[in-house]
UniProtKB/Swiss-Prot annotation:
One function term, GO molecular function aspect: toxin activity
Domain remarks: The cysteine framework is IX (C-C-C-C-C-C).
Changes after translation: Contains 3 disulfide bonds.
Residues spanning the signal sequence: 1-18
Tissue: Expressed by the venom duct.
Location within or outside the cell: Secreted
Positions of the propeptide segment: 19-50
Disulfide pairings: C55-C70, C60-C73, C66-C85
GO cellular component terms, A-Z: extracellular region
Protein name as it appears in the record: Turripeptide Lol142
């Protein structure tokens, strides 16, 4: 029981401190929305975009073996005799 109360107390103190102290002190975030939901949505959009742009360097013989976000299957210097999926 005592450990549960301690955890609750520490959590509540940390939540209060997180609201008191500013997150950005450089002034860059002055024009950003402070709504946490919109920040989460923005973060998820950035992750989705970066995932779309990622092309894994899988071993391949033809372009058809590569994922849709890769443009070609070609020899890449330093990867040995195998072809790799690449994004140009």
């Amino acid at each position: 029981m005592a450990t549960t109360m301690t955890v609750v107390l520490i959590t509540s103190v940390l939540l209060v401190l997180a609201e008191i102290f500013p997150r950005d002190t450089d002034g860059q975030a002055a024009h950003k929305s402070t709504d946490q939901l919109s920040q989460l949505v923005d973060h998820l959009k950035l992750r989705k975009l970066s995932r779309r742009q990622y092309c894994p360097s899988n071993t391949c013989n033809e372009r058809d073996e590569c994922p849709g976000n890769c443009n070609d299957c070609e020899y890449v210097p330093g990867t040995g005799p195998n072809k790799r999926c690449v994004k140009k």
